[in-house]
Amino acid sequence: MPLFATNPFDQDVEKATSELNTAEDWGLILDICDKVGQSRTGPKDCLRSIMRRVNHKDPHVAMQALTLLGACVSNCGKIFHLEVCSRDFASEVSNVLNKGHPKVCEKLKALMVEWTDEFKNDPQLSLISAMIKNLKEQGVTFPAIGSQAAEQAKASPALVAKDPGTVATKKEEEDLAKAIELSLKEQRQQSAPVSTLYPSTSNLLTNHQHEGRKVRAVYDFEAAEDNELTFKAGEIITVLDDSDPNWWKGETHQGVGLFPSNFVTADLTAEPEMIKTEKKTVQFNDDVQIETIEPEPEPAFIDEDKMDQLLQMLQSTDPSDNQPDLPELLHLEAMCHQMGPLIDEKLEDIDRKHSELSELNVKVMEALSLYTKLMNEDPMYSMYAKLQSQQYYLQSSAVSASQVYPGPAQSGTYLVAGSAQMTHLQSYSLPPEQLSSISQGAVPSSANQALPSQQTQASYPNAMVSSVQGNSYPSQASIYSPPAAAAAAAAAAVVPVPVPADVTIYQNAGPTMSQVPNYTLTSSTLPQTGGSQQPPQPQQAYSQKALL
C-alpha cells in the first residue's frame, strides 16, 4: 500500500499526531472521522495517512496515530472496517510489529484483539482474526480479550515525556498520588478543610460514574452496531457511564447504548442549530448584486473549420423540435456573423483581382492575334527594295556620265569615268550633224550638255549588257540610225581626236574597272544621205528596269 502518496487527510492527520501535542485534540480527531465518509476514497486515504504516521520513528507520534486509528474504527462505520480488514493493512501491521517500538506494538496488538471481538459476527471482517492467528503461528503473542494487559495497553498514555524536567514518570505520579491520599485523610480528621491543588486519588483511579447526569445531543447519530444508541440533534441523553473518553453509555426513550462523547454537550441550554452555525455556516447576502462578466470578444477572423462545424450542426438540428438551441450552436453562429464583413471584403478583393486578370488576358489575346496576322501576311519590304534599287541606278548613271572622253577615231567610242560598281553599259548614237563637228576636233555643245546630266537625252536608249563585249539581248531597244549617205560622209571626215592623259590612265586601269559606259559610233549606224541632213526624229522613251 503506497503510504507516501499525497491525499487530503495528510494535513489533518499530521496536525492531530504532531510531536508538539501535549494532549489528544479530540475535536480535530472527530472532524477527521466525519471527513472519512464524505468521499468514496475517504476511508482508504485516511487509513494510508494514519499508517504513515504509525510508522514514524518517534514513538510519541506513533502512539497518537494509533489513538486516531482506534477512533476512526469506532466512529466511521463499516466503510472503514473494510479497509482495516484488507491485505494492505495486514502487511502494514506485520511491518510495524517487526520494526516498531515495543509500546507501539503492544497498543496495536491490544487494538487488534478488541477489533476481533467486535467483528466476530461479520464474515466480511474476518481477516483480523485470521491475521492474529497467522501472527501467533509466527511467534507473536497477543493479550487475551478483556485482560488487564490489554486494558493497560489501551489506557497507556499516548504522550511520551519530551522534557524530563517538566513531566514526571509514571512511578513518580504513583508516589505523588499516594502522598495526596495520605494528606486527604489527615485533612478529613481536622475540622477545617484544607484546599489542595491536586485531585484526589479516587478521581484518578476509579471510574467516573454520575448517576442522573444529562447531556444534549449536538449532532445526529445513526447506530452502526447493535450496542450503539441512535439519537437526533437536540435530544436529552442520560449518561450512565463515561469512563471511556471516546464512547459513553447513555439512555434515551429509544433504549440504552453507546454513543460518541463528542456528539453531545453538557450545556443543556445550547441549541444544536446554534452550535452548528458557529462551527460550519454559509451565509448569503440578499443585497449582493450578481454581475455577469462577459468575456472580451476575440478578434474576428475567417475560420473555415468553425463555419463547417456550424453547418454540420444546423443540418443535424431538427427545426420542429421545441427544445432550445445548444449554447455551442449559438456561440458558433455569433462568431460566423462576425466573419461576415471580413468575407465581403475578401470577395471584393477576389473580384477585383479577377477583373484585372481578365483585362490582362484580353490584351494578351489581342497581341497574339496581331502577331499571328503579321506572320501570315507577305513581307512588304520586297517592293520597297525594288524601288530603292531603281532610284539608286538612276543616281549612279547620272554621276557616271559627268565626263566624256573621245575614243579611237575608227570606232568613235567615248569613255566616261564612272564607278567600278556599275554593271550596265550605255550606248548612244549621235546624229550626223554632230559627227562633223567631232571630226573637226570639237564636240557640240548639245552633246557636252547631254552627257553629264542625261536629262535632255531621254531619247537615247539604254541597253542592258554584260561585261563580255558583243552580247546582245532581245529586250534591247532599237537605236536611231541616220541616213547612210550622211554616215559615210561623216566617216570620211573623221579626224582622230587626241585622248587626254586622264582618259589613258582610266583605260589602263585594268581589271579594277570591269565595266564602264561605252559610247560607240559605227559606220553602219550613220545615215547614208547626199548633201542634206534630216533632223533627227524623236526616239521612244525606254523604261529602265533593274537587273536583279
UniProtKB/Swiss-Prot annotation:
Residue intervals of the ITAM domain: 369-386
Residue numbers bearing the Phosphotyrosine modification: 198, 381, 384
Source domain of life: Eukaryota
This protein's GO CC annotations: cytosol; early endosome membrane; ESCRT-0 complex
Organism: Mus musculus (Mouse)
Domain VHS: 16-143
Cross-link (Glycyl lysine isopeptide (Lys-Gly) (interchain with G-Cter in SUMO2)): 276
Record's comment on post-translational modification: Phosphorylated on Tyr-198. Phosphorylated in response to IL2, IL3, IL4, IL7, CSF2/GM-CSF, EGF and PDGFB. Phosphorylated by activated PDGFRB.
Residue numbers spanned by region Disordered: 436-458, 517-548
Domain UIM intervals: 171-190
Bilayer topology annotation: Peripheral membrane protein
Compositionally biased tracts (Polar residues): 517-532
Tissue spec. comment: Ubiquitously expressed. Enriched expression in synaptic vesicles.
Its biological purpose: Involved in intracellular signal transduction mediated by cytokines and growth factors. Upon IL-2 and GM-CSL stimulation, it plays a role in signaling leading to DNA synthesis and MYC induction. May also play a role in T-cell development. Involved in down-regulation of receptor tyrosine kinase via multivesicular body (MVBs) when complexed with HGS (ESCRT-0 complex). The ESCRT-0 complex binds ubiquitin and acts as a sorting machinery that recognizes ubiquitinated receptors and transfers them to further sequential lysosomal sorting/trafficking processes.
Protein name: Signal transducing adapter molecule 1
Record domain SH3: where: 210-269
PTM sites of type Phosphoserine: 156
